[in-house]
Design a protein with these regions (language model features):
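Hinge/lid segment of periplasmic solute-binding proteins
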Residues: 137-186, 227-232, 250, 341-347
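Conserved N-terminal structural module of periplasmic/extracytoplasmic solute-binding proteins
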Residues: 6, 12-14, 21-27, 32-35, ...
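Glycine-centered hinge/linker elements that transmit conformational signals in sensory
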Residues: 214-215, 266-302
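Extracytoplasmic/periplasmic substrate-recognition and gating elements
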Residues: 101, 107-109, 197, 334-399
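Short, solvent-exposed loop/beta-turn-alpha elements that line the ligand-binding surface or hinge
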Residues: 151-163, 167, 228-231, 236-237, ...
Length: 482
């Protein structure tokens, strides 16, 4: 209190309150009144202490502490972003620095968590120290946090959102989360290998062409014709079904898109018609058939993601894996020259998704509705700036490696060939919804569909049993999770 008093006395002996918060103005006013009434410093100090305690108990100073994140008189605003894509952290820091330089009254703190800890960490944060902006990604997030998610429908950037990208977080006509980045998957190939085998990428843009190209390369591998140039090359594909999200999430999406147009549709369905399960089988068999374990598919259940990527595609042991643009950094780290040889062809299902890439939004940001008005205003401005400013857009694409789910990034190119393929597919419309599986009952796509595929490959279940189990468990899980 004495420090505050001394710093506010002018040369003429009066008090200046310029730049002081309303809380500090109150303290000084109480001290000044005590002196005017003939008191001493100690009496003044006691007066202020008693007054402050009473007012804090009544809640008058609820917004004066540091937790409020802003000072309404000085205009300073502090907010926290809780994000879940650790690979983008450096890019986010660059964006924050740019924004803070343009807005010196704003301080943005970045917290990043990824992997299996994301959901639990966010839940703990929301209970103790809720962030202003937080990452969300699925229907459970809307269910768990919908009551504290700010309506962001009025953001200017929403006018540029690609069709369907806001569906997951739209309720009663209002949008509660901002789509941040898209991802897409198909068959990631070493195009140089195929070209050396006499197969062009353009010839494999539908299922028949892809099968013909794979057969051609397989024959040349089996005959030893590729050995001199590619000594590590063993097979056309790797299929790591130890990873339930590969045989489950992504491959079962083929079946689900037959029955549901969007994840919202799947989320609201109590039953699964199962009309696309023959196509699901076709793609499982297709992938397994081009691996070194084609004659003993049970072994595929021991092959993991790392063996297929860093120990497979990136070292040219295989020419193809079913994956998405997200594998580019790992390939670049292993062998940057191999990344430059890569391309992605569509996840073509004959007569159904020929020429289509499976894409979807896999990351969103929400704004905490209980933040102060100033924090919410800055949060909206930061997000809008990040997605509309040309320099900020470049950082998102080039540093964060994002594929934007908006139509106003037209002139910005991706830094790797896989992301560029997905960006081009978005522009041309050669896409299908790749995240319908996110509307399935909790655990269904991996612990039911993924596990059933493992049983099928191990010879422990035929495909009719796989189909029946998946359909039955959908209904059971829907009932228990309501």
């Amino acid at each position: 209190i004495l420090q505050l008093w001394n710093s506010s006395i002018t040369e003429k002996g009066s008090i200046s309150i310029k730049g002081l918060s309303i809380c500090d103005q109150f303290f000084l006013g109480q001290m000044w009144n005590s002196f005017i009434q003939g008191g001493t410093y100690m009496k003044a100090k006691k007066t202020v202490a008693i007054g402050m305690a009473a007012l804090m108990m009544s809640g008058v100073f609820a917004g004066c502490g540091s937790g409020a994140g802003n000072d309404s008189d000085s205009g300073n605003v502090s907010l926290t972003i809780f994000q879940a894509k650790i690979e983008a952290n450096d890019g986010y820091k660059k964006l924050i620095k740019e924004y803070e330089e343009k807005h010196p009254n704003v301080e943005i703190n970045l917290e990043a968590v990824t992997g299996n800890d994301t959901a639990a960490t966010l839940k703990a944060k929301m209970q103790s120290d809720p962030p202003t902006i937080f990452a969300v990604g699925g229907f459970n997030d809307l269910k768990d946090y919908g009551d504290v998610m700010e309506d962001v429908s009025d953001l200017d950037i929403m006018k540029h959102a690609l069709s369907g990208t806001t569906d997951m977080f739209t309720k009663d006509g209002k949008i509660y989360a901002v789509p941040l980045y898209m991802e897409g998957y198909g068959f990631v190939i070493n195009k140089q290998m195929f070209e050396d085998a006499g197969v062009s990428v353009d010839s494999m843009m539908n299922f028949d062409g892809m099968k013909k190209g794979f057969d051609t390369l397989k024959k040349k591998i089996d005959d030893g014709e590729m050995k001199d140039k590619y000594p590590n090359l063993e097979a056309v594909m790797e299929y790591p079904t130890k990873e339930l999200w590969i045989a489950g999430d992504h491959d079962v999406n083929v079946a689900l898109t037959h029955d549901f147009e969007t994840a919202n549709d799947a989320y609201g369905a109590d039953t699964l018609p199962g009309t696309g399960f023959e196509d699901y089988k076709k793609m499982v068999d297709f992938q397994a058939g081009y691996t070194t374990n084609a004659d003993n598919t049970a072994n595929l259940n021991s092959v993991d993601y790392t063996a297929s990527l860093e120990g497979g595609l990136a070292i040219e042991r295989v020419a193809c894996i079913k994956q998405g643009n997200w594998v580019a950094p790992a390939v670049e780290t292993t062998d940057a020259e191999v990344l430059n040889k890569l391309d992605m062809i569509p996840y073509s299902v004959p007569g159904y998704s020929d020429g289509k890439y499976f894409v979807g939004v896999s990351g969103y940001w929400a704004i905490h509705s209980k933040s102060t008005d100033e924090q919410k205003k800055v949060a909206k401005d930061f997000i809008n700036w990040m997605l509309t400013d040309s320099e900020a857009q470049k950082i998102l694409v080039e540093d964060c490696k994002f594929i934007p789910p908006y139509d106003n990034f037209a002139d910005i190119k991706a830094t790797d060939p896989l992301s560029q393929r997905i960006m081009d597919a978005n522009k041309s419309g050669n896409t299908m919804n790749g995240w319908v599986y996110s509307g399935a009952p909790n655990t269904w796509s991996q612990q039911v569909a993924g596990v059933e595929v493992q049983k099928y490959l191990a010879g422990e279940a035929d495909w009719d049993e796989v189909t029946k189990t998946c359909i039955d468990q959908w209904s059971k899980l829907k009932t228990t999770q309501k």
